[in-house]
Regions:
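A broadly conserved amphipathic alpha-helix scaffold signal in soluble, globular proteins
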Residues: 87, 91, 107-114, 155-162, ...
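Structured helix-beta-strand junction loops
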Residues: 27-31, 96, 160
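Conserved donor-binding loop and adjoining core beta-sheet/short helix segment
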Residues: 26, 36-108, 113
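Short Lys/Arg-enriched alpha/beta "domain-start" segment
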Residues: 12-16, 20-31, 37
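Acyltransferase donor/substrate-recognition loop-hinge adjacent to the catalytic core
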Residues: 119-189
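Conserved small/polar residues in nucleotide/adenosyl-binding loops
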Residues: 1-4, 191
Length: 191
C-alpha cells in the first residue's frame, strides 16, 4: 500500500481557459506523447463536462478531472522527478477523500509507473477509450481496402440524411449537443 504523507503542500490547480493555451502547449508540444487527451482543443472543449483543471508542479504539467463520481488524473507531462510529482498527485487525491486514479495511461506510461512505483498500481485496459491514429492524407481520400467500411458508413449517412448541414457549435447549442450525446448513450446502453 502507498504510505500516507503528512505534507501540507497543495497543488495550485486552476480551471483551463483560452488564456492558458501557451502554458499548456509549452509542455504538450515538447512531449513525445501524442494522444487526444493532451490536445488543447479537446481540453478546452471537454473542460465543462469533466471539470478539468491543471497546474504546473516541479516542471510538470498535471491535470485532474472528474470521470463521473471518480476523481482522476492524467500522467504528468514534463521533465524532472516524476516520482515526487506522482506522490503529490496521490496526496491530492487523499485530500479530496478519493482513491488515486489515473486515466489515459498508455503502455509506455505504464512501464514508467511500474519502474518508479513498482507493484503499487492496478492497470485496466478499456479499448473504448483508445486513440486511433491515421494519416491526414489517408482520411482525406479514404483510398484502399482498409477504408472500405468508412466509405460505406459515410455513404450510408449521406443517403439517410440527404439534407444534413454543417453548423458551428456555439454556446447556445451546447445543451443541444449534450442532449444528443445523452440520447446516443441511451441507444448504445451507456446511460
Amino acid at each position: 500500500a502507498l504510505p500516507i504523507s503528512k505534507s501540507n503542500f497543495m497543488i495550485p490547480f486552476k480551471d483551463i481557459t483560452l488564456a492558458d493555451k501557451d502554458t499548456i502547449t509549452s509542455f504538450t508540444m515538447k512531449s513525445d506523447r501524442r494522444n487526444c487527451d493532451l490536445s488543447f482543443s479537446n481540453l478546452c472543449s471537454w473542460r465543462f463536462l469533466y471539470d478539468t483543471q491543471f497546474a504546473v508542479v516541479d516542471n510538470f504539467l498535471v491535470f485532474k478531472f472528474w470521470a463521473g463520481e471518480q476523481l482522476a488524473y492524467m500522467m504528468p507531462v514534463g521533465t524532472g522527478d516524476l516520482k515526487a510529482v506522482l506522490w503529490k498527485l496521490i496526496e491530492d487525491a487523499r485530500k479530496e477523500n478519493q482513491h488515486f486514479c489515473m486515466l489515459g495511461v498508455c503502455s509506455n506510461m505504464r512501464a514508467d509507473l511500474e519502474a518508479i512505483l513498482p507493484e503499487q498500481f492496478t492497470f485496466t485496459e478499456d479499448r473504448d477509450y483508445a486513440d486511433y491514429i491515421y494519416l491526414r492524407s489517408d482520411l482525406s481520400t479514404l483510398k484502399g481496402k482498409k477504408f472500405q467500411a468508412k466509405r460505406n458508413h459515410i455513404n450510408r449517412f449521406r443517403n439517410t440524411y440527404p439534407d444534413y448541414e454543417y453548423t458551428p457549435i456555439t454556446p447556445d447549442r451546447i445543451q443541444e449537443c449534450l442532449d444528443l450525446e445523452a440520447e446516443w448513450c441511451k441507444e448504445i446502453g451507456r446511460a
